Amino acid sequence: MWTPPRNDQQYLNWQWYSSILSSHAAMCGCPDAVAHFNHLASVLRAPQNPPPPGPQRNLPLRRLPALPAAPEAPGDRAPWPMAGGAEGEDGGAGGDADHGGAAGGPEDADLLDAVAAAETLLEIPAKKPTPRAIESLEAYKSLTRNTTHRNSHSIPGTSDVASLARKLFRECNNNQQLLTFFQQAARDPGGTPRCTTPAKKGSKKKAYFSPQSSSSDESPRGKTRSRRKAGRKAQRKRRRPSPSSSSSSCSNSESWESNSDSCSTKSKKSTKIKISTLPCYQGGGI
């Protein structure tokens, strides 16, 4: 079934007219857009169309506001407040002349001093020594290594160098004590090492060995052996052995003496004191 299109000629004209009204309302605030359009057409001398039907109405149009007045001329300004001389134009001229020349009074001198002080504050002082460009690696190394660093420690002996020196001195003393210990052990193998307590600061005492007599008479085994010999001699004096018994007794005595000698050698070997190679000192701050 055929239907007429929606956008016919009348609908298109209505859309065009509504667009004109909306554009006029966005630009201007007068109530009659048609009269405004006719006025513009007469001013701009555009081709005019026949006037629309109906009475003509001349409505007032809005105009732009006037610009503000120009500022006053520079010659009409007030005189310089710090000018000397009479008031008015003559005083202003005299004040300008005095200001351009020498200072007129103490106030002007103070003002000039303040300006000079401000200028000196604006100046950047030059660095001493004057910096120079580094052109090679050798120059960079020489400049960085020649710089001296001040010691930031207020208490003497608390810096890293002083603490390292104290540790090194302590280790040297410990090594010296170990050396003397081994030397004494090599000289007297049968001695017993004794260590002294750490001395006070300023006094140095070395470890010493107490010599022990190597004679078998002072040892307990030597004493028992001497007692046995004395008992055997008393028994020999009491008895009067026969030749056969004397030979057997001699053989027995020889075997017994050989056994006693072997036992004495074993006892001597066993009585040897083993000297430890470990240090026998107590580390202390020197």
From Swiss-Prot:
Keywords: Phosphoprotein. This is Probable protein VP2. Residues 67-108, 184-286 are annotated as: Disordered. The keyword Cytoplasm does not apply. Residues 242-265 have a biased composition (Low complexity). InterPro entries: DUF755 (IPR008474), HEV_TT_vir_Orf2/Gyrovir_Vp2_N (IPR004118). Phosphorylated at C-terminal serines. Pfam families: DUF755, TT_ORF2-like. Residues 222-241 have a biased composition (Basic residues).
